[in-house]
Amino acid sequence: VRGGEEPSFSALSSKNLIPNESYSPATAPLAPGTALDLSGDEPQPGAYFNYQSCTAAWSFTLADARTIAVTASHCGKPGDKVWAGTADGDFSYPAEPIGEVIYSDFYAEDSHDLDVAFIEITGSADYYVPGAVDNSVATSLAHLPLHVCKLGRVTDETCGTLIHGAAMAQLNSGGLQRDSIAARARVCSTNGDSGGPVYGEVEGEQTIVGVVSGTTQRLEEGHTCETTQTDMELSFTLATDIQVLAKEVLGPMA
């Protein structure tokens, strides 16, 4: 999140998961970890431009040929425009939008308590991606990997141990508090990494198992994950829940 507090969480209850399956989208316009800028405003020369700096978890194509990218719900509302982000986090002007948020669960009339948004990709650009992650996404899991990593546009790849699986939590973002179903791991992250992929080894294969939602602590200004010893915990929305939601609100995948 740019210009606001990173969401924080406190676990309330637990939820069981199911056996292992995954899929690799046949067509994926954005690589996992792609930097994104989102805003409900239009950039104007010489004027202040307020936008959210976030990351894409993965992308896929629907049966109706629309291409979709996945990020965090607190990154944007339906109707927000999306631009390709840069390595330094500064907005690159002039630039044409590459897409638009078409669904954001926190803003849905019938929310599923998931920190996830879907972006319809309608354009292309030079994308910044800080690393490579296999585009294999979990559709069901017997259990989450005990060791997971995340890829974000700001802190790149960081890894750590799983603390617990899916649980109801309280997410605080932009002064608002929301219920959110999320797992948690001891992984460092910061503003701008939200929406990025969380992944681990499932049956010997690197698999995306979630989407970065927030952290229990802030990374102090001027510090990095490499230079900071912290008990920070990362919360992430499960990919399995996102897959079910995508079919419900968007329709079948290609």
Cite the ranges covered by each PLM segment:
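Short, well-ordered strand-loop elements centered on a beta-strand within folded domains, enriched
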Residues: 9, 65-72, 205-211
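Active-site region of chymotrypsin-like
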Residues: 39-57, 122, 126-133, 156-253
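Surface-exposed flexible segments
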Residues: 2-15, 136-139, 221-232
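Serine endopeptidase catalytic core focused on the charge-relay Asp
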Residues: 41-170, 200
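Noncatalytic regulatory segments and standalone regulatory/sensor domains
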Residues: 1-60, 254
